Amino acid sequence: MKVKEQLFSLNAYVPGKNIEEVKREYGLSKIVKLASNENPFGCSKRVKEALALLNEQYALYPDGAAFELRQKVANHLKVQPEQLLFGSGLDEVIQMISRALLHKGTNVVMARPTFSQYRHHAIIEGAEVREVPLKDGIHDLDAMLEQVDYNTRIVWVCNPNNPTGTYVEKQKLLSFLENVPKSSLVIMDEAYYEYAGAEDYPQTLPLLEKYENLMVLRTFSKAYGLAAFRIGYAVGYAELIKKLEVARLPFNTSTVAQVVASVAIDDQSFLQECVKKNAEGLEQYYQFCKEYDVFYYPSQTNFIFLKIGLPGNEVFERLMKKGYIVRSGAPFGLLDGIRITVGLKEENAEIIALLANLVKEHVKKEETYS
């Protein structure tokens, strides 16, 4: 059976190790998973209440148009319902967009490193991938603009960026949008939008009225704590969204996912409490980094990327043996760093203590050999 040649250059997505797998491998009873940027505080109590009361006819297909959720999200964002495209997580939204816009002879422009699925789906569709290295951990929009040409169909801007947690400032983005050809779609992946609190972080939704070639992606998987339900969405120019709907699988978001997302978006007080606690958790890591002279990127997300002076894979393995799962920077091409999801206060303190011991051990070893 022949498949697309480009599939041979790709690997299936490999998520971080799960809790049960690590328990079995290392014979541990307690595992703290801080690898996948999930919300450690879970989801709103209203979601749990809604699930308990859910009495749907499960033999029936879900609402393919996600009408009720569409109205809820549109009202919350102050956009029109027809500007929304829903998917089974942002992974599917990215797949839909790539499938609709890309083919051999087209290209996409993106940062390196950034979220891997942009590149993955571009290659599947036969498009050329033009990757521009980050500059001081941030998207280099000027260099990215130089890579845009007549055949550029998509420019991906992950803001805040995964895996660095950094962001593109408002004025730099506005200048970029003014210069990108109208034939190229600029997609702002704002999966971590709710955590971004910087004063000059761009508010992109109002810009949709001016830039028809702008699209914004958001998700319920991160700050809303609904990763298990797989639901994300795109916001864009209504005419383009209408065309993209053709690439959407029928009934792609489940009845349960639509219900819990509709309930979650109403509980903004829970969301803000999560954001507040996340900021406090980040501060724990900042204090550790400053005390031990550890490099880190200031984060606008629920994770932090840092370098303690050891290879990322080594730190990953040593922490995992202690029952703490983080993400090595190696899969992103950042061999000397790790990405850690901000956890509960006590979880942060525990992993910081382990990191401090690794730093001390490394410093002592270097002094021995010097």
Curated annotation (Swiss-Prot):
InterPro entries: Aminotrans_II_pyridoxalP_BS, Aminotransferase_I/II_large, HisP_aminotrans, HistidinolP_aminotransfase, PyrdxlP-dep_Trfase, PyrdxlP-dep_Trfase_major, PyrdxlP-dep_Trfase_small. It comes from the Bacteria. One of its GO terms (biological process) is L-histidine biosynthetic process. One of its GO terms (molecular function) is pyridoxal phosphate binding. It catalyses: L-histidinol phosphate + 2-oxoglutarate = 3-(imidazol-4-yl)-2-oxopropyl phosphate + L-glutamate. PANTHER family: HISTIDINOL-PHOSPHATE AMINOTRANSFERASE, HISTIDINOL-PHOSPHATE AMINOTRANSFERASE 2. This is Histidinol-phosphate aminotransferase.
